[in-house]
């Protein structure tokens, strides 16, 4: 049963992730997806939900929406191109927005 909840949440999170990639070019989609996943995750954590809903919303939806592997690929490309400052800026912005979004989400 848990698998079905995770899969259902993952379907919707993955669809939203794909939709963001259609709306925003490149790194903007990754930044938007990760920030939105952090905001939603912070909000869902604050609700003290039953375990199955936590699996559905946090592990499934937020897990599929966030895209840390794409972030690693994008940071790796900047690193290989020796674009140190853009890499550090992108990494800093991602973590700053992510942590801020979790903080905000927990207070909504």
UniProtKB/Swiss-Prot annotation:
Reported function: Fluoride-specific ion channel. Important for reducing fluoride concentration in the cell, thus reducing its toxicity.
Protein family according to the UniProt entry: Belongs to the fluoride channel Fluc/FEX (TC 1.A.43) family.
GO molecular function, one term: metal ion binding
Location in or out of the cell: Cell membrane
GO cellular component, one term: plasma membrane
Protein encoded by which gene: fluC2
Residue ranges of the TM segments: 1-21, 39-59, 84-104
Protein biosynthesis is among the record's keywords: no
Regulation: Na(+) is not transported, but it plays an essential structural role and its presence is essential for fluoride channel function.
Reactions that this protein is recorded to catalyse: fluoride(in) = fluoride(out)
Listed PANTHER family: FLUORIDE EXPORT PROTEIN 1-RELATED
Predominant location: membrane
InterPro entries: FluC
Record flagged with keyword Transport: yes
One GO process term, biological-process aspect: cellular detoxification of fluoride
Keywords, in A-Z order: Cell membrane, Ion channel, Ion transport, Membrane, Metal-binding, Sodium, Transmembrane, Transmembrane helix, Transport
Protein name per the record: Fluoride-specific ion channel FluC 2
Listed Pfam families: CRCB
Membrane topology: Multi-pass membrane protein
Binding of Na(+), residues: 63, 66
Disulfide bonds: none
